[in-house]
Curated annotation (Swiss-Prot):
Residues 208-228, 1090-1106 have a biased composition (Polar residues). Residues 18-31, 181-197 have a biased composition (Low complexity). This is Uncharacterized ribonuclease C609.01. Keywords: Cytoplasm, Hydrolase, Nuclease. Residues 608-921 form the RNB domain.
Length: 1157
């Protein structure tokens, strides 16, 4: 055998460390640990420091580059005029730069370039050339030099600024914000005597303008380079906290910060002249109050992270409650709760941030007070008495479980109309469940904190949305005339609009963006109504600490709401998909090896060209099957294209692939990962010699054992390509395909450690938890199902990925790229389903036991209930580097101790990186050449963008379904379908339309009920129905008033709110839905009248108002009550309506009343 081939030996694979095992480092004993806080491994904190330094190094290198963005033309004074300037290309925004950072102009020498202020005239800082002045160098050394004074010495006798700008008398406040768990316990995580964990953050001296935007500061380049070359972080075990000089302004800013921003100090707004001295700007600018904390200087972050004062993690915003966010880190066992926009500090979804921990009890108390204040204000506007307002506000706060509106069968408190509409707009745009993380004293977060710096922003430069002349709130809409008069008076010109307009992003997690009025089309102010259905692209330009909203730039209009192509473009931009074309030079940088392959390359590889290899559904890898002389013993070969041989590290094509991360597969189209010509050259092609990395396994199909397994580089000669449809059609007649299917069953049994007969199709739905759905364009059945041959190939891929990861772990365990999926923290729902169905599962069940139980269950409803419940519980997978004694890197969903991505190198960048690691292992170089910091940067970028791409694919699926449903709604009325009940509660019903993949939580306050009762022991919900007009009740409760709904209401709803036509598609799948949408006649219409009847109905419905509260009240006693029992695992009838009157299509799903059945 070729010496480059490696025989797989399980004895060389390191075992997964036990959480209870004692590490060899200076880990404190269990008696010395504080509470249940986890011990922080030194390599985990060290990895954060190294990653930060890698970002700073990339920052300093990228500032000398200028990427052009040819697809976007910012609107100028006349954006739609014929004399459009061709040289208005904007430089591509630097993803590493915090908000407000500007990039140098390559046409201007750096020593003469100066930052430009908002008006475009004047400067806001010194020239870049002044950074080398002796004055600035001396000042930098004084700022970052340590001192011996204690932190408490600076905090005594401090006073905060007035709460309101311009207050007559400055009143001192003593309110200080506590850090997390500060106490006298020497082993407290924030105790100075405990060097093993977090210590309280000390304020930083420096100009407010520098901290607001580090890259605009005069010391930014000097500080970044100094931190990279002179600051070496020490071990967090023994290093003491550095003492840093403080100024009164920065002390007040960090110590007296409150969540509502009331006690934040005024900004100093200091600047520097050419000699380095401080100068003040106008007094008017000093009147602006800081609403957010300035960011910490980038140069100070490595020290703070190394001493445990700050944690680094990725920020995720709650989609339903956008004031709350969470930061996920590798250090803590649970996410860090971020309360409110002030603590989130101008960050966006997916940002890599630095967080300081705060006291959880104080954060929760502040949140409770804010919610009670909001509820009290809303109740006061409704005319309630003062006593009633106070009592109801306390009752409806987060301290009680009645916040969602139900209390043991009585509709005591319904959600506010704002809450109902917000939930509908968020969940209606989604394919899967959108859980609202409700906080109560019983379910308070374990950690809380606030953001003090943004390290990396991987999100795209643009987002989609609509324009509004005034800020979208009730007060502005009621006073449009006064706003118009005031703006005209202040400008001195009659009819001139305001100075700014508002951009409302389609993604509600992005705040409103202020756009300068000179960037909008000239006719926007005169014909504002013409732009209500226009979708634009805009980007955030800067976000100062004194502004509640960011300032942005308007780029272009992409079309009209309701157009499927416009929605597709919006998805691409909102989820950071790279829409620009590849440079032509990248298409010619890779050439296929000549045939025959040179002899020197053949000597390095195992020659498998004589094997009959074939491809099924993909050109990333090929298979071969050999039947030996022994009955039941076969040889299965999996040969993956060696893309890493062609795409060399650090070449331009490699850089572009690293930026794109992976291919984006959407139903409306795909965003390629590599140029088309390059992909064709490096993919496997039948009839050509191809370079591959092969894993060959010898299986005994009778005993289900692996006799031999080998891994190494090879050369193959593929003979044929078979589509998935053809493979499935010939599965019963083709011997090779049957052996592939049998091999998949054997390998899956080995992975799950069982000898039971498995249903591989039942495991397919968990592919959602590991990334994008493969072959999404070929979906024609259920979203959760695929061809049996496709399921078999998926299981073979999982086995191969596990073996590759295990082999790399045996070579260099500290640098191997792994794919981990953490075990769910809460198994309550799965245990409840197990008790309900009689399945033997518990919270201590292993992943193999859970998956085996699902794959062997015979009852279809029980299997679906277990599938969907577990899928909803599972965490998202992510990439990580190596292992440590405090980190779990196992893959829960696939039941693998080690897992990676290897089989699709033409679609994912991580697969190419894994191939490079394999090359190092084959060549006998255990010390992987790529440094640790670069690997961390790669995995962080891949994690964030992979999450964006998966959400984009889900949004694409939902948009496609809504277009089909909307087409049927227009012709045949509401779509009736069966739904599977997943869970019930006293406040909601969770249902899944299995064939479409639609998941919804139906709140009971949107159903026309007279009463309801929930039996917690039996998990049953009893609904007493008032009327059969359930769809009309739901739409009226949500106050839906869109053009799409109004057209539907006039055509199909009668005077009593009943739908005159219902399209019955109870057992339809996706392909049936597509056929029905394409047909010219109504499909499965329940009722169809003649032309005269339709005209009469349309006329009568158009003359009656059926949307008022009086009509809802009249419906309550119109029908006799009918009691319906709902339980998990039951099938119910639902009505579906799709609304395409927004940038992203909405779907409304409600239960069909049994009165109309």
């Amino acid at each position: 055998m070729d010496p480059h081939w490696k025989r797989h030996d399980s004895s060389n694979i390191p075992t997964q460390p036990s959480p209870s095992a004692s590490p060899k480092s200076n880990k404190p004993s269990s008696a010395q640990r504080f509470g249940n806080l986890p011990w922080v491994a030194p390599d985990v904190i060290q990895s954060q420091i190294e990653y930060l330094q890698a970002l700073q190094m990339q920052q300093s290198l990228s500032e000398s580059e200028n990427y052009l963005q040819p697809n976007f033309f910012p609107f100028q004074s006349g954006p739609f005029s014929k004399s459009r300037r061709e040289n208005t290309l904007l430089p591509r925004l630097n993803p590493l730069a915090p908000i407000g950072a500007r990039q140098p102009n390559p046409s201007i020498p750096q020593q003469f370039s100066k930052p430009i202020n908002e008006s475009g005239t004047g400067t806001m800082g010194p020239a870049v050339g002044e950074l080398t002045s002796p004055v600035m160098k001396n000042r930098a050394e004084s700022i970052f030099s340590p001192v011996t004074e204690s932190f408490e010495a600076f905090t005594q006798g401090m006073q905060t600024t007035p709460q309101r700008a311009g207050a007559g008398v400055s009143t001192a406040t003593s309110h200080t914000r506590r850090r997390s768990s500060a106490g006298t316990d020497p082993f407290s995580p924030v105790s100075p005597s405990n060097p093993n964990f977090l210590t309280p953050l000390k304020p930083i001296d420096g100009n407010q303008e520098w901290q607001q935007s580090p890259l605009e500061s005069p010391l930014s380049m000097h500080s970044l380079q100094e931190s990279l070359h002179s600051v070496e972080p020490e071990s967090p075990i023994f290093q003491q906290a550095p003492q840093i000089p403080l100024s009164n302004a920065s002390q007040q800013s960090y110590i007296n910060h409150s969540s509502d921003g009331a006690s934040l100090p005024q900004s100093s707004f200091l600047n520097f002249n050419s000699s380095g001295k401080r100068v003040s700007v106008s007094a008017a600018a000093q009147q602006h109050k800081n609403l957010f904390l300035p960011y910490l200087p980038q140069a100070s972050l490595p020290k703070f992270i190394g001493t445990g004062k700050l944690l680094v993690g990725t920020l995720h915003i709650n989609r339903k409650n956008r004031s709350d966010a969470y930061v996920i880190t590798d250090v803590l066992d649970e996410p860090i709760f971020i309360c409110g926009s002030k603590d989130r500090n101008r960050t966006l979804e997916g940002d890599l941030v630095a967080v300081e921990l705060l006291d959880v009890n104080e954060i929760m108390q502040t949140k409770r007070e804010k919610e009670e204040k909001k509820i009290r204000r809303n109740l006061s506007l409704s005319g309630s008495s003062k006593y009633s307002v106070n009592s109801k506000a306390k009752m409806m706060s987060i301290s009680t479980p009645m916040a969602l509106g139900m209390n043991r069968g009585v509709l005591s408190f319904e959600r506010s109309i704002e809450k109902r509409k917000n939930d509908y707009e968020v969940t209606g745009q989604s394919l899967s469940f959108v859980d609202d993380v409700s906080l109560t004293p019983d379910s308070a977060p374990k950690y809380a904190g606030h953001v003090v710096a943004v390290l990396n922003r991987p999100s795209g430069e643009t987002c989609s949305g609509t324009l509004a002349l005034y800020r979208p709130n009730s007060l502005a809409l009621k006073n449009q005339s006064s706003h118009r008069r005031n703006s005209s008076t202040s400008s001195g010109e009659t009819g001139k609009g305001p100075k700014i307009v508002w951009f409302k992003p389609s993604d509600k997690r992005i705040p409103l963006i202020a756009i300068s009025s000179d960037q909008v089309p000239p006719t926007f102010f005169t014909n504002n109504d013409d732009f209500k259905d226009k979708v634009f692209l805009a980007g955030i330009k800067r976000w100062p600490t004194t502004s509640l909203h960011p300032f942005g730039t308007l780029y272009e209009s992409i079309g009209t709401i309701g157009d499927p192509k416009v929605e597709y473009k919006a998805i691409l931009h909102d989820f950071s998909c790279h829409t620009y074309d590849f440079p032509e030079s990248l298409s010619h940088c890779v050439k296929r090896l000549p045939t025959p392959i040179p002899a020197e390359e053949l000597q390095k590889r195992y020659n498998l060209r004589d094997k009959l290899t074939f491809m099924i559904g993909t050109r990333d890898y090929a298979l071969h099957i050999d039947t030996g002389s022994i009955d039941g013993v076969i040889t299965l070969g999996i040969h993956v294209a060696d893309v890493a041989y062609y795409v060399k590290q650090d070449m331009p094509l490699d850089d572009e692939a690293a930026n794109r991360v992976s291919e984006v597969q959407l139903l409306q189209g795909s965003v390629p990962f590599l140029p088309k010509k390059v992909s064709e050259e490096i993919s496997l092609i039948e009839g050509h010699d191809c370079l591959t990395i092969s894993i060959v396994v010898q299986l005994d199909l009778k005993s289900g054992a692996v006799l031999q397994c080998s891994l190494g580089p090879s050369v193959i000669h593929p003979s044929s390509f078979i589509s998935l449809e053809s493979a499935q059609a010939n599965l019963q007649t083709n011997e090779a395909l049957q052996l592939v299917d049998a091999s998949a069953h054997v390998l899956t049994k080995l992975r799950l450690k069982t000898d039971k007969k498995l249903d591989l199709q039942s495991l397919y739905c968990f592919e959602f938890c590991d990334g994008q759905i493969p072959n999404i364009q070929n979906i024609n059945m259920s979203i959760f199902e695929a061809f049996p041959i496709a399921c078999s190939l998926q299981q073979i891929e999982h086995w191969v990925n596990e073996k590759v990861a295990s082999h790399l772990m045996s070579v260099f365990p500290s640098k191997v790229i792994l794919r981990k999926n953490q075990r769910p923290s809460d198994f309550a729902s799965l245990v409840a389903v197990s008790e309900l169905t009689g399945v033997n599962l518990s919270a201590s069940s292993t992943p193999s036991e859970i998956m085996t139980e699902i794959a062997t269950t015979k009852d279809k409803r029980t299997k679906m209930l277990l599938q969907l419940t577990l899928r909803r519980m599972c965490n998202e997978s992510e990439y990580t580097i190596g292992t440590s004694n405090a980190k779990d890197v196992s893959h829960f969903v696939f039941s693998c101790p080690y897992y990676t991505h290897f089989c699709h190198p033409t679609r994912r960048y991580i697969d190419i990186c894994v191939q490079r690691q394999l090359r190092e292992a084959f060549d006998g170089r255990p010390d992987f050449s790529k440094d640790y910091r670069s690997l961390l940067s790669i995995t962080q970028s891949c994690n964030t963008l992979s999450n964006f791409y998966r959400n984009a694919q889900e949004k694409s699926l939902h948009a496609y379904l809504c277009q089909l449903l909307h087409s049927i709604n227009l012709r045949s009325g509401l779509v009736k379908h069966k739904a599977f009940v997943l869970a019930v509660d006293q406040e909601y019903i969770d249902i899944v339309i299995y064939e479409f993949g639609l998941e919804r939580r139906i709140s009971l306050d949107l159903l026309p009920l007279s009463n309801c009762d929930f039996n917690e022991q039996k998990h049953e919900l009893y609904l007493s129905w008032r009327t059969n007009a359930s769809f009309f009740y739901a739409s009226s409760s949500l106050e839906i008033d869109t053009p799409c709904f109004n057209d539907f209401k006039k055509k199909f709803l009668d005077s009593n709110g009943m739908c005159k036509q219902i399209c019955d598609m109870m057992d339809a799948q996706v392909r049936d839905l597509a056929n029905a949408a394409e047909s010219q006649e109504s499909f499965y219409s329940k009722a169809r009248g003649n032309d005269s009847t339709s005209k009469t109905a349309k006329s009568s419905s158009g003359n009656q108002d059926i949307s008022g509260d009086g009509k809802l009240h009249s419906l309550r006693m119109k029908e006799p009550e009918v009691v319906q029992t709902i339980r998990p695992g039951q099938e119910v009838s639902v009505l579906i309506f799709a609304d395409t009157s927004a940038t992203y299509s909405l779907s409304l799903i409600t239960l069909q009343s049994p009165l109309s059945s």
